[in-house]
Amino acid sequence: MADSPLVFPSVEAQRLEPHLPDLSTGTKNDVSSSSSLPFVTLTFATSLDSALSLGPGIRTALSGPQSKAMTHYLRSRHDAICVGVGTAIADDPGLNCRLAADSTPQASSHAAATAGVGALLGLASVSTDNAMIGETSSGITARQPRPIVIDPRLRWDFTPKSKVMQLARAGKGLAPYVITAVPQPPESKRKLLEDAGGKFIVLNEPKSSDTRMDLSSRRFDWHSILNAVRNEGLQSIMVEGGGEVINSLLSGENSQFIDSVIITLAPTWLGQGSVFISPPRKTSPDGKPSAVARLTNTTWIPLGEDVVLCGKIAS
């Protein structure tokens, strides 16, 4: 928890702007959009062979210092960040923003709606239920995203010592919302979450006949997840991982929910046995294989030894 604040240059932040939710509203930049779902950014770091880590449960550092700072800048620009239960168990992540106060964006979607022009101009410290702008004594920005953990069967045995809970108590992050299919989570876990400002969000588990669901891993359907997030007043969400979550979001019709893709490419190969980003291949009506998805409106941004690829899923 002694991690120092990070700084992300404004010139690089400006290059990312076309790929992010609107700064003042947190919603989709396309004013013609009538979607009631949050703005969804899919972002992750990958090796040259499209691997996230050396193996299941193995924490693998891929991002260099510049692209790591970029990730925290992206967190500051979203109302929520989302990971799967596997990542929560394997990494014990903090799921907060460590951007230095002078690198904080001037507005957030929630702050803009509640604090008006003063917040937009950065003239006041703003605190809301879902997002905050200002500075703490640590020098780390108080504008924090809400962690969302997808945990259908409550496999994540979080405790007061879990990093995300410690950061929430210290005022350096927010407590998570845990999306689960368990109708009555344990009272001790519920109290622990709620005392820190988090909670359980209970969704009905899709039936095996639900075509929107990846049957091999029994996931929730993404429309239900994103609708639940939006119902909490969160207008933008950054999906960070892990592999099952990313592959699921890229699969089939799920990719229609993605508004922006931001991928950090690290100059390394992880090799066989790694956790790869490789969603199920599509098949054309005549039975021939076809590509799952392609990016359009792409931007390439060198950051140190890494390269960041930004784009939008082609329709």
List where the protein language model places each region:
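Enzymes that bind and transform nitrogen-containing heteroaromatic metabolites
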Residues: 1-315
